[in-house]
Amino acid sequence: MNPVIGLDIAKGESKGQVFLQKGKPHGKSFDIQHTKEGLSQLQEILLSVEEMAGASPTVIFESTGHYHTPISQFLEEHQFVYILVNPLIAHQAKKSSLRKVKTDTLDAYRLCELFYKEEFEPHKQRGLKLLELRNLTRQHDAITNLLIQTKLQFHAILDQVFPEFRGVFGDLYSKVSIHVLSEFPTAESVLASSETDLANRIAARCPSRSTRWAADKANKLMAAAERNPFRAPRLQSHLLSLEMYIKILLQYQEHLSALEKQIDALAMDLEEYLIIQSIPGIGGKIAATIIAEIGEIDRFNHPKKLVAFAGVDPSVFSSGKFTATINRISKRGSSRLRHSLYLAVLCSLRKSGSKRLKAFYDRKRQEGKPHKVGIIACTNKLLHWIYVLLQRKEPFLDMA
């Protein structure tokens, strides 16, 4: 017998169905809660099916973000084999029936049927370090997106309170710039202070700079206050919003700095991190994201599978005598990996980047390929290089 248990996972609970072999469901469907008692119930079901069928059952369920984490972690701890199905494949299987019926019980039933139709590979447990790195890099991306949104809102408020402040410091979001703005949020507060006092405040915020630099910034700040179209905002709510956004910006910057330190410390212990960084143009953050999203390279037995995992494989459409000649990439893989590879290619095509990749890009352009097509071709080529480098555990050798 080849037993399988299909689980339709939802938030905090799952609906299950047991098959002892193809076409032979066993018993009625069951419910389990994602609690200690519920997982113990699942273990009892697994052991009873194993005793009945004479073989350990495989558990199959759809990838549901973080909802399936309690189930997958429990199965790994108790060394049960499970298959994590791509949601797209599961969705296509659910649509195979002519009847428009959708229930959790039926979904679990169809997952069992899908197990016998397709040849799935058991899910391979990833190393803890790579999982930690993946979570850290994803958290970094999430906070970066929040920081970008906050900057946009901060800009809108600054335009209504102190628009001329933008040109005072080279980087509006540097710590010294943000702290000075928090102390002097309006043109009125700047003009109420002397230029010497401003210079001393700026110098205290940035002790690594010279007093001459602080005096120059104080002069620019005073000039900006004089040029500002209004001394103080008409609405006090704008001033409160500005103070709030300043605090949020500083908090996000602090969180990102802490995450970057943890990512660097964790990545330095991984051999793959140094191997990918040997490719000219790829820095620490991009290298960490790439290896975190790829995971163990042994999961892929061919570079084309890695290309498909990144979603940069071409989509193909052919019907009858028609075959499409303009094919877009599938975009069905890891979007974070795809974005990191895109940035890696752009960096590698610079003067200080990879000469081999630049030569490959130039060749594609000479063939008449548009810029974006050349970039995707370079992404595909870069993935093949990464696959070989990680398999052989060798650094990248560029053209002389």
Show the residue positions of the predicted features.
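A detector of single, family-specific signature residues
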Residues: 1-400
